[in-house]
């Protein structure tokens, strides 16, 4: 089955431009250097599946003309991946069923606490997002496609990436556990965290991510969760031909 993947956001948790920064990338005229918080949309068989609801989701949805949403998967509960949940409201109002949200138990509980007014039946506000939380305890089958959770390490925490068809999305990665590599064979497309060149305690560097690419051997790799240390055009010129920086608005066709 054919699918389309759209990069809604390719940036780090602070986004690019970063508030208060006067660096060349933050003031770059190249639109590829404008990076909202990290998220992707996968469309297939008339369905739309979102990975993470960033604080920039409203802007991302308007930019890409998103008209409907059928499910949301969460990688983990950090602010740059969940704070846009309330902005799914307009997409939830004209559906016969609530939009299902899928998260690890710890992240589902965090969502319930942070968005209590949505999930607590004692709150009687009108106009709430019509969503329903489900916990991830294994593969998630959505509209005929299996989304396989891939455990990755993010600093001291274990979080999720996802394998779907011949593609995988691994954002916020400092290392990949040995047991997860078996889920990454035969990929056409890999999205992989590559924050910058300088080491970081919770994110992979460009150099480390290139080592991962050499082991996994996907046909194409797109780095994501990119900070303002990496100018788009200049960085791409240093990468192997099958590896590129992703960018907001990038669209790819693939087999799911």
Where is each model-derived feature located?
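Cap/insert and terminal regions of metallo-dependent hydrolase folds
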Residues: 175-256
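Binuclear metal-dependent hydrolase catalytic cores
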Residues: 1-170, 236-255
């Amino acid at each position: 089955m054919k699918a389309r993947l759209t990069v809604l956001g390719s940036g780090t948790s602070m986004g690019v431009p970063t508030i208060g920064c006067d660096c060349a990338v933050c003031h770059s005229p190249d639109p590829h250097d404008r990076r909202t918080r990290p998220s992707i949309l996968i469309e297939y068989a008339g369905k739309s599946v979102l990975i993470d609801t960033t604080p920039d989701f409203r802007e991302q949805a308007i930019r890409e003309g998103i008209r409907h949403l059928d499910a949301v998967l969460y990688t983990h509960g950090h602010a740059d991946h969940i704070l846009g949940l309330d902005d799914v409201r307009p997409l939830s109002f004209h559906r016969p069923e609530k939009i299902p949200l899928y998260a690890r138990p710890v992240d589902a509980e965090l969502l319930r606490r942070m968005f209590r007014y949505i999930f607590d039946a004692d709150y009687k506000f009108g106009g709430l997002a019509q969503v329903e939380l489900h916990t991830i305890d294994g593969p998630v089958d959505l509209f005929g496609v299996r989304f396989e959770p891939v455990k990755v390490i993010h600093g001291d925490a274990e979080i999720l990436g996802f394998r779907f068809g011949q593609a995988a999305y691994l954002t916020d990665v400092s290392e990949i556990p040995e047991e997860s590599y078996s889920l990454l064979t035969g990929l056409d497309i890999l999205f992989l965290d590559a924050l910058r060149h300088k080491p970081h305690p919770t994110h992979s560097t460009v150099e480390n991510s290139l080592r991962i690419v050499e082991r996994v051997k996907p046909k194409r790799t797109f780095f994501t969760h990119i900070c303002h240390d990496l100018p788009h055009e200049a960085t791409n010129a240093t990468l192997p031909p099958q590896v590129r920086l992703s960018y907001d608005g990038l669209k790819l066709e693939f087999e799911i």
